[in-house]
Amino acid sequence: MANEKQYPMTKEGKEKLEQELEYLKTVKRKEVVERIKIARGFGDLSENSEYDAAKDEQAFVESRIQMLETMIRNAVIIEEDKENPDVVSLGKSVTFIELPDGEEETYTIVGSAEADPFEGKISNDSPIAKSLIGHRVGDEVTVQTPGGEMLVKIVAVK
């Protein structure tokens, strides 16, 4: 599997995936196996919704374990760019304001494996991140979004 996809992520993001993998393998997998055993005791498996639900959950857990193992195995840790501290890049937080008088927003740009917009982490493949990467504090940038274009000014990069 020489051409497996690489997954850029922060060290913290990789650790979070490793914790989830450990939980799925040591706790969740056992819980699901136990639920399957209990559901088998309910009789006819052809009309046993508890058994079907437990088997579906088992398939989901096993699929997630495989996905996590692949992402961890192919993780590329994002190193901090100390030579260009004011340039937007993977692993950095960027604060910008929508022009002419919009509100301030801050996002951390991460790899797709650890993106979580609700935690302020956006994928480097997102339209906003693609538009901002490579720009620096003070730059005005046109960002393409599903809702149309917006003009933003970068006010901070950390």
From Swiss-Prot:
Gene3D superfamilies: Transcription elongation factor, GreA/GreB, C-terminal domain, Transcription elongation factor, GreA/GreB, N-terminal domain
Pfam hit, one: GreA_GreB_N
SUPFAM superfamilies recorded: FKBP-like (SSF54534), GreA transcript cleavage protein, N-terminal domain (SSF46557)
Record-linked PROSITE patterns: GREAB_1, GREAB_2
InterPro entries the record matches: GreA/GreB_C_sf (IPR036953), TF_GreA/GreB_CS (IPR018151), Tscrpt_elong_fac_GreA (IPR006359), Tscrpt_elong_fac_GreA/B (IPR028624), Tscrpt_elong_fac_GreA/B_C (IPR001437), Tscrpt_elong_fac_GreA/B_fam (IPR023459), Tscrpt_elong_fac_GreA/B_N (IPR022691), Tscrpt_elong_fac_GreA/B_N_sf (IPR036805)
Coiled coil region boundaries: 10-75
Signal peptide bounds: none
Keywords for the protein's UniProt record, in alphabetical order: Coiled coil, DNA-binding, Transcription, Transcription regulation
GO biological process entries: DNA-templated transcription elongation; regulation of DNA-templated transcription elongation
Gene Ontology MF annotations: DNA binding; RNA polymerase binding
UniProt similarity note: Belongs to the GreA/GreB family.
General function of this protein: Necessary for efficient RNA polymerase transcription elongation past template-encoded arresting sites. The arresting sites in DNA have the property of trapping a certain fraction of elongating RNA polymerases that pass through, resulting in locked ternary complexes. Cleavage of the nascent transcript by cleavage factors such as GreA or GreB allows the resumption of elongation from the new 3'terminus. GreA releases sequences of 2 to 3 nucleotides.
PANTHER family per record: TRANSCRIPTION ELONGATION FACTOR GREA
Listed name of the protein: Transcription elongation factor GreA
Species whose genome carries this gene: Geobacillus thermodenitrificans (strain NG80-2)
